Amino acid sequence: MRYTVEYTSKALKSLKKLDKPVLLMIKSWIEKNLIGTTEPRRHGKGLTSNRSVQWMYRVGDYRIIADIEDEKLVILVVEVEHRSRVYK
């Protein structure tokens, strides 16, 4: 059973603001590691506190915050930001 990747409107808005090389790096990483995966938690780290149901993926100096919906086999990308701004 393979997972698909979907994006929230906030995540799409964040992606549009990125420089082209950074955008290509993040898209390439998502295609390589998340699209079609059977183990979406393998490359990420579970968050704690008020974001305990979300997962974080490191891509260079950027972070991808996602919800993993096992019953739908969907990885929902919630936020993409530079590491200095993502948790604020």
Features from the language model and the residues they span:
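Intrinsic disorder/low-complexity segments in short proteins, especially the signal peptide
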Residues: K20-L23, S52
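Secondary-structure boundary motif
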Residues: K17-K20, G36
